[in-house]
């Protein structure tokens, strides 16, 4: 309702998410300067939302309406539309949703179950929320980098590791790799002796998350493909 939206904004809300699509509520929220994310389930509702100038809509209930496979099909005609799936999203399928680049975020009550709130079990809510963040980021050890002084030194070290452990040898432009697990750089890189590379499912989300811990990333070291990924 208008009253609920007003109270949410007065309480400091910066965006409004609704279960369904009500054009009147969307227009009212936009008139108040709110970022509106209404619930949609059909192409018709999505087109109405786009006609109002929205670029992001909620997809609800997600699993019952076909899940990420449905959204990938809808992405054909709606290439610029972004989605926020909720409904049936949980720790087991969260990564599958977020792997699709037209999904900006996911929501789910599995992190804040009603009984946990009633029991004031904040520790369990915290654990589930942290688990969701870890799942979203998908951090894993990618490789260890070793600084070498020359291409010959890098080649020699990589071949030694490959011979000793049966790793696959791969020559690259700036380094030589042993099974993608060890990168021997052809010239000294960052770090005194080398680096530890941590992989993530989303660089932008990882940069934001690490920033909360005081980690500063160097933008000049970022490499992207033709699509900016």
Regions found by a protein language model. Give the residues of each.
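Glycine-enriched alpha-helix->loop->beta-strand junction motifs that scaffold or abut catalytic
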Residues: 10-16, 30-37, 51-56, 77-81, ...
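Core segments of cupin and vicinal oxygen chelate
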Residues: 145-183, 205, 212, 223-228
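Vicinal oxygen chelate
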Residues: 126-127, 139, 181-187, 211-229
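Catalytic cores of alpha/beta
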Residues: 2-11, 44-53, 69, 89-105
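C-terminal helical cap(s) of enzyme catalytic domains, especially alpha/beta-barrels
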Residues: 29-33, 115-137
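Glycine-rich phosphate-binding active-site loops on the catalytic face of alpha/beta enzymes
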Residues: 19-25, 58-68, 102-125
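N-terminal beta-strand motif that seeds the catalytic metal site of vicinal oxygen chelate
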Residues: 133-158, 191-198
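Catalytic beta/alpha-barrel core
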Residues: 1, 5-6, 12-22, 35-46, ...
